[in-house]
A protein has these predicted regions:
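N-terminal, positively charged/glycine-rich alpha-helical extensions of SAM-dependent methyltransferases
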Residues: 1-12
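Conserved alpha-helix/loop element of class I SAM-dependent methyltransferases that forms part
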Residues: 8, 15, 19-42
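Class I SAM-dependent methyltransferase SAM/SAH-binding core
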Residues: 43-45, 51-101
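A short hydrophobic/small-residue beta-strand
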Residues: 66, 141-142
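A short acidic, Gly/Pro-enriched loop at the edge of an enzyme's catalytic core
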Residues: 100-112
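A short SAM/SAH-binding and catalytic strip from SAM-dependent methyltransferases
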Residues: 110-123
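A short glycine-rich, Lys/Arg-flanked "PGG" loop and its adjoining helix->strand segment in the class I
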Residues: 125-140
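Conserved class I S-adenosyl-L-methionine
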Residues: 142-161
Length: 161
């Protein structure tokens, strides 16, 4: 169902100018990759990767080695099939696991990102603790999440970004 409605990228992206929805999604993902300063050969973790649309796009864009993790085995199988079909299985792979208990060694990633995923964690502090554990010292975690507040004031410029 998600793939039919959203394509391979199950996330929001604001539209700019005459961008298509697909172009907006790519810009959103490329911005995230650029903020992480990803480069060829870096090992990167996508927490809550779905079927791996952003993982494949970021791997193509940066030539980094992207590992996606999702709790859903169907998504792993579908995503890995798409990695192979799109010719990026040497750069991107998906694994089944829980971001509350990441199945990776300490300090094993040059960067970690999550796109609208960690908001679903039952214990965000534990989830972010796991992310910190698998990040190499000095590496960055980047995250896009929905945030809601009753105190939103749209006239405040910094809240429109």
């Amino acid at each position: 169902f998600y793939e039919w409605g959203w394509g391979a990228c199950f996330h929001f992206a604001d539209r700019r100018g005459r961008e298509t929805f697909a172009q907006s999604l790519l810009r959103h993902e490329y911005y995230l990759a650029s903020r992480l300063a990803l480069k060829a050969g870096d090992c990167v973790l996508d927490c809550g990767c779905g079927i791996g649309g952003p993982a494949r796009n970021i791997a193509r864009f940066t030539r980094a080695q992207v590992t996606g993790i999702t709790i859903n085995q169907f998504q792993v199988d579908r995503g890995n099939a798409l990695c192979k079909q799109e010719g990026v299985s040497h750069l991107a792979k998906l694994v089944q696991g829980d971001f509350m208990n990441l199945p990776f060694k300490d300090s094993s990633f040059d960067g970690v990102y999550a796109i609208e995923a960690t908001c679903h964690a039952p214990d965000r502090a534990k989830c972010y603790g796991e992310i910190l554990r698998v990040l190499k010292p000095g590496a960055t975690f980047a995250c896009y999440e929905w945030c809601l507040t009753d105190a939103y004031d749209g006239s405040e410029r910094h809240k429109k970004r």
